[in-house]
Each structure stands twice: as structure tokens, then as C-alpha cells.
Amino acid sequence: MNLKDFIRDIPDFPKPGIIFKDVTPMLKDPGAFKVCISSLKELVKDFEFNLIVAPEARGFIFAAPLALELEKGFVPIRKPGKLPYKTVSVEYSLEYGTATLEMHTDAIKEGDKVLIVDDVLATGGTMKAIAEMVEKVGGTISGIVSLVELSFLEPRKKLSGYEVRSIITY
């Protein structure tokens, strides 16, 4: 099964000139979604980690079933004000402005080995910010994986020093 067949292009979303890679057709098809999670599992089989972290919202869709399949813990990374307990945060630059991500202060402990998972790896900014936040609290990044990588945006430049893998590359 070719997973690219389940990803559609949405022109000019979220703004003119952007071609958005929409993974929702894959989610609607149980066979394709199963192949996606199995492919992610295969992609990370040689990484050593005890936790998977992912940013909201689409990162959760892929990371949570992967964590369950691999019997690893899952840590949600959220936008400010969405988590009920004490948080640690990181601010990072976007094309226009800045954004902030948070996680619970007790989610990652010194020595935890962490895998970062998201649906799309575009510029690498979100993944880099998550990696910095994990490292700030004593975790180690074992790897960074995504379903889709937009290689023409050169995300690996921002993520040099980390092992980065993707199932589909455009």
C-alpha cells in the first residue's frame, strides 16, 4: 500500500502559496492508518527510548497509538494554558512571530530517552523547540520521526545533531 495515495494536497492553506499535506484521508481508512502506525513502528525499531512526545493536535493521532503498540509512555506537548498541572515551556520563532509549547514539569525525568513524533516535518522549528524543552528538563532525544517530511524546506538543517527519519518525503 502506498501511503502517499492517502495524503491530499490542499492549495493555499492555511495561507496563499502554501500547499498543505492533508493526512485526514489516511485516518478515515483503517487499513491505511494501520499501515502508517506499522511503518512508524518499523522506522523506530532500532531506537532506544522509554517515552514518546508529540505536539498537539495531529502529532497525538500518530504518537499515541505508536506508544501503545510499543508499550512506551506518551507525553502530550500542548499550547499554553491547556495542561492542568505545573508546566515547563519553550518559545520559538515562526515565519511571522513566535509560538509557545508546554509540557508538565514532571512528564520527563533526568535520564529519560525520548522519541519525538509528529505528522509533518516542515521547517523543523516545532521539533527543535520540543527537543530543547526535553533536554532542558534532563531528557535525551533518541530520535525524531514524522509521517511526512517536506525536504524542500530543509528541516534537517535545524535538526542537525539529531537522528531524523520520515516515512514519506516530498
From Swiss-Prot:
EC number(s) per entry: 2.4.2.7
GO cellular component, one term: cytoplasm
Keywords: Cytoplasm, Glycosyltransferase, Purine salvage, Transferase
One Gene Ontology molecular-function label: adenine phosphoribosyltransferase activity
Catalytic reaction(s) noted: AMP + diphosphate = 5-phospho-alpha-D-ribose 1-diphosphate + adenine
Xref: Pfam families: Pribosyltran
PANTHER family referenced in this protein's UniProt entry, alphabetically: ADENINE PHOSPHORIBOSYLTRANSFERASE
Subunit field text: Homodimer.
Name of this protein: Adenine phosphoribosyltransferase
GN (gene name): apt
